[in-house]
Amino acid sequence: MSIKILSESEIKQVANSYQAPAVLFANPKNLYQRRAKRLRDLAQNHPLSDYLLFAADIVESQLSTLEKNPLPPQQLEQLNAIEPLNAKTFKRDSIWREYLTEILDEIKPKANEQIAATIEFLEKASSAELEEMANKLLAQEFNLVSSDKAVFIWAALSLYWLQAAQQIPHNSQVENAENLHHCPVCGSLPVASIVQIGTSQGLRYLHCNLCESEWNLVRAQCTNCNSHDKLEMWSLNEELALVRAETCGSCESYLKMMFQEKDPYVEPVADDLASIFLDIEMEEKGFARSGLNPFIFPAEDA
């Protein structure tokens, strides 16, 4: 990984030099409020409105849990500067299971029969079983956990990682621009990339699907293999083109790119989920998705 989280002494050394931040850290409350509203707005007249509204319910349950049960200060002094909260190696607090219980409690009254069955399964699962499923998901062994359970477990894990990311230094610098495929905070996958407006006008940031951080990657470069060749942009509606898929002919992957200048309310997770028909189109063209949406997990192996 090529983005380093700076210590306090390193922050002081670069304090007088301005450059676009390599990493943007989320504002938890604002993020969940914006995402839930965007999901509900996108659900209007959408063929998959029921699922978008279900996703909005989960996001609102994350917000409610955040407000009722915030993460206490963690012992984070001896972390690596590179991927300090690495999803595969960081020793997580068991409070994430409390978050899962609270999220399930929030969703249960609104659940249909299928979702209710998933909630019941997770409520009856032992702590060891929940931790095992979490380990598989964090190791990116997504095919080993059924997608209906993964959505809830990931929502709780993400709420934990998002808050943990608030407790580490928030300054960073690029050490090597060639290896930016995974989140420099937790090592997880991107959901999509977003081209910013405002002080970061025109810069592209990838959005993490776990800790919700964003990291800068130059445009016209594959987000999966660094190739500058054989890149193409696709969209279902060229007139609007708020959400496009950037495909790479070198590694045959794709990741969506969104443009705030076309809609300042665009939100990576919500708009990625709502543009699932673009995913279908890309897969039909032979491209594999290089990122992961926290509401769309691969099917479990039979």
Curated annotation (Swiss-Prot):
Q: Quick one: a GO biological-process term for this protein?
A: protein maturation
Supply the Pfam families for this chain.
FdhE_C (PF24860), FdhE_central (PF24859), FdhE_N (PF04216)
The answer to keyword Cytoplasm applying to this record is: yes
Superkingdom, taxonomy of origin: Bacteria
CC annotations in GO: cytosol
A molecular function GO annotation: ferric iron binding
- Compartments, as annotated in UniProt: Cytoplasm
Extract the HAMAP family matched here.
Answer: FdeH
Q: Its biological function? A: Necessary for formate dehydrogenase activity.
Membership in a protein family:
Belongs to the FdhE family.
Q: State the protein's name.
A: Protein FdhE homolog
> What organism is this sequence from?
Haemophilus influenzae (strain 86-028NP)
Please name the gene that encodes this protein.
fdhE
